[in-house]
């Protein structure tokens, strides 16, 4: 079973939201943005409900600073999107949380996936929302995530294609190397 929780900094203790708001207005020119909220979303599989409840209070959040909920309150938001690391990209937040839960339980390490959920408030056009997404999502390390709760966190990865092997590379002359570069689309 997959458990999900959302953790948000308390109002007045959320500098990341303030920084996003300032950057969007000043650098992106998104003047219609009046507020932003950010949640850290944790999906956890491989633990029992009592351990998950304990982890919500002791691993995923700092009770004096954070609000923990089962759902992100995005009722009046004009746009909501989530950002997660690309598959294969190391997720330090998820790994650290999994290690902490393993220490708490003295058992197996659970599977954890994290994402940041952004809610934007104000009068925004589709172009404004896309500009904010482009600003927040670094395509080298992250992608837009689904807002739906997954059935499982097990990854199903496709078998990678066979990599081409170049025979006789070390004995090629300049003309053959040049032809190889252009035929394989190589840069150097």
Segments (PLM) and residue ranges:
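Core nucleic-acid recognition elements
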Residues: 1-188
